[in-house]
């Protein structure tokens, strides 16, 4: 019996890392543990999450795919096929970009580029996440980017972040955003993590 109690306590503590609650009431360790356990974000070779570093379009595309039901559809290794002139064959994110574009979560630019190394702003991330949740521009009130940012916050996706329109996202911001995504409401009314 004495061995059973510590085991049960350890099990309960481990499972709480996997239960997503809005980031507003969650501590950093729970948020980080959840996004890492789900494979949405990983640290560098030393395990450092580099939470103050900015995020680029390629990294964000990977996070979108890893947070989606399509995460297993990404071929292992880099692809020899690229949709964009500036995403070279063999680029580490080629497959993630392909899936994110095919699903309509992100788009390229009219000049045929994706700009994978370009940092991403809040409004760009908000638009992509809303599309991931099934929302279309016609479901929103107002115009870009205010409509997207308003819906993003109304769904609780921005809990735990301080950036505003026009500002670049950090890895720390993305960690909270993707944590919040798990409990966000989809267009169909279900909780995202259950879809």
Predicted segment positions?
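Feature responds to low-complexity, polar/acidic, surface-exposed segments characteristic
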Residues: 2-31, 36-61, 65-94, 102-168, ...
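Extracellular, beta-strand-rich glycan-interacting domains
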Residues: 178-180
């Amino acid at each position: 019996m004495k061995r059973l109690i510590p085991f049960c306590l350890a099990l309960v503590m481990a499972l709480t890392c996997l239960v997503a609650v809005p980031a507003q009431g969650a501590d950093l360790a729970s948020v980080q543990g959840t996004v890492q356990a789900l494979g949405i974000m990983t640290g560098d070779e030393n395990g450092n999450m580099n939470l103050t570093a900015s995020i680029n379009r390629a990294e964000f595309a990977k996070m979108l795919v890893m947070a989606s039901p399509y995460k297993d559809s990404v071929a292992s290794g880099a692809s020899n096929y690229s949709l964009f002139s500036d995403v070279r064959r063999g680029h580490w994110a080629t497959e993630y970009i392909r899936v994110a574009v095919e699903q309509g979560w992100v788009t390229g630019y009219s000049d045929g580029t994706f700009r994978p190394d370009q940092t991403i702003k809040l409004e760009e991330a908000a638009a992509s996440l809303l599309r991931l949740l099934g929302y279309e521009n016609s479901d929103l009130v107002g115009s870009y980017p205010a409509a997207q940012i308003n819906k993003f916050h109304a769904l609780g996706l921005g809990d735990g972040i301080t950036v505003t329109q026009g500002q670049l996202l950090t890895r720390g911001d993305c960690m909270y955003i993707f944590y919040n995504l798990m409990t966000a409401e989809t267009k169909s009314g279900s909780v995202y993590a259950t879809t």
